[in-house]
Amino acid sequence: MKKTKIVSTLGPASTDVDIIAQLIEAGANVFRFNFSHGDHEEHLDRMNKVHEAEKKTGKTVGIMLDTKGAEIRTTVQKGGKLEFHTGDTFRISMDDSIEGTPEKIAVTYPGLYDDVHEGGHVLFDDGLLDTVIDEKDDANKELVVTAQNDGLLGSRKGVNAPGVSINLPGITEKDSDDIRFGLDHEIDFIAASFVRKPQDVLDIRELLEEKHMEHVQIFPKIESQEGINNFDEIIKVSDGLMIARGDMGVEIPAENVPLVQKTLIRKCNAIGKPVIAATQMLDSMQENPRPTRAEASDVANAVFDGTDATMLSGESANGDYPVEAVSTMARIDVKAENAFPEFGTPRPQFMTNDVTESIGDSVTRVAKELGIKTIVAATKSGYTARMISKYHPDADILAITFDERTRRGLMINWGVTPIVVDEPESTDAIFDLASKKAVESGLAKEGDLILITGGMPVGESGTTNLMKVQLIGSKLVQGQGVGDKTVIGKAVIADNAADANSKVTEGSILVTKTTDKEYMPAIEKASALVVENGGLTSHAAVVGISMGLPVIVGAENATDKISDGELITIDSHRGIVYHGASNAI
């Protein structure tokens, strides 16, 4: 199964319930709603359609609200677009009531004049038009700039000043209104645009507290040099990270973006916080059914870097091939995951005093050593599953939680499949439930080993303190085991010695009520014994010890519960007989 999660942006190309359902089936785990576009009514309609698609597919997804953020844009241009040529000189006004002309344009942020300096650059429309500041006209509060390249400039286009600390607010009034709207409609994640300092995140967290929605996770979007410089402090107050490479690639030199991506992913991996690699990952698929080879490499390398999720923007929101974009990204993710041992960044070993995280590390190690394919984490808050995910185990992670909000919050974490169940009353109930749900989820089958982690008291956050290796199988009978071997073979049910001696063949497992010396011809050919009567001093037990033969004695009603010729597994260490071939240890 795919372990890397996919964040898919919804838009005009993905409004239909059937299309959204196809996106889910293709591999989308979280849907992003970009509040830079559209109104609340439009977004609510799409949210409702997502829930319809969930019912249609029987699968759960997360919902992410992406804020517009405090950004600088140009005002409306006279005639719609202005044309500039290299060497053209014009002015930038701070008066947002001015309509742009080839001689003077205006921006929406009056503080830009004070923030920038002569010799610095002002970029427009994602850097498509580059200008250098020649002069600051204090009298008119205008910047005199010279175009560094030919280009067209439209209305309401983005403005960037690379390397400059911009004194815009962390969140705008629109952002606050949008977030409150999202919280009223049960969003799971907030992608906070243009975060530059920790306070920007804390301002959003105040809104969560106001609505008693502290479970909603905040993912700051690092899009500037200032945000990069303050990252270590920003991530401390955040739940994860989105590496928004679009504006970042305008604010810092493009050649630095891959290095920043690797650094930020590594830092998030180290503290176990999920990270999303975003922007232009399969950009050409807005118009083409296949990605460029460079785009395929970009997605794969993000997986190799250790990202938890890869994201689609315009590809799924506005493109001609939204479903194909998701399915293509899913195939690339899986291919890269399979090659991770050879090409991926090794997971560093982290030192910690946190009990849950230590168990997460131990669970990953034990699963690898025993070849376990599924880890089941019983978790109230989701923290246990996140700490296991941090170590990127080869095994799938099935998170059993007791709250729908926790389930949705885990949709972004690498390798985690979350489900909701009724809260069990005891650890034994957790163990039984873990086996049942692992099979129902298709992550394990009879005969597989699973590794279960949970805590006591059951249902309390932060109590993860145990792990158990458990065999999934139909236990037929149990008694006292002699030896420590596991044997798989066909059962031979014998009523007496003559019956046993005539029916037992080399390697079969003798199942009988009792044994004595007359059973020896059969015992010498058998690979194991299951006997209803007797204890550790019985004939069967003594023979088993002397011959090194796995034996289970005191297996009540074994001759009735086990069928003649049935394939069974003898776990003499635990004294258990399982139906079928099981990987008991």
Where are these regions (language model features)?
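Acidic, glycine-rich flexible loop/linker segments
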Residues: 70-172, 437, 443-498, 503, ...
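Conserved alpha/beta-domain cores
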Residues: 3, 8-12, 42, 164-279, ...
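ATP-dependent carboxylate/acyl-activation modules
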Residues: 88-89, 265, 269, 276, ...
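Glycine-rich phosphate-binding active-site loops on the catalytic face of alpha/beta enzymes
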Residues: 10-12, 29-40, 189-194, 241-252, ...
